[in-house]
Amino acid sequence: MRCLSTYDETYRGLLEELIPDLPATSVICPPFHCDHGDGIRLGEHVFVNANCTFLDGAFITIGSYTLIGPCVQIYTPHHPMDYLERRNPKEYAYPVTIGEDCWIGGGAVICPGVTIGDRCVIGAGSVVTKDIPDDCVAVGNPARVIRCRM
């Protein structure tokens, strides 16, 4: 999908096959990488910039009017910390939810099971390992809330 434009009907058709109920107002720039596609739910007017990776072993839900910067990675798969448990070929997945009117900066990583509230800003390059409440700005590795708007 790297050579296709966001305005290319072929590319849009492929996305609509891959992601059920993809709103006509939402844009996913190529290249875009995902595990399955059917675990991704986007609201209206969502913008996903180039070179993002969504590993959707569990649901990834992104609210309306949210902006996703380039090279953002959203992961739902999780593996055990214990090395003996990792020898079993098991993979667990935990859903990721991003609220409405959020801005996820370029290169951010959203880890399994995380919920980011409405109207949040996640700084570029941040690694979000825990939930972020509504109306907050979070930055860093691991991401920490540095400001709340309300």
Tell what function each PLM region has.
Residues 19-21, 67, 89, 129:
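Generic structural signal for beta-strand residues in well-ordered domains
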Residues 133-134, 139-142:
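Acidic, glycine-centered active-site loop in nucleotide-sugar glycosyltransferases
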Residues 32-42, 47-115, 141-150:
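Flexible, glycine/small-residue-enriched loop-and-beta-strand segment within the central core
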Residues 27-29:
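Conserved short histidine dyad/triad with adjacent acidic residue
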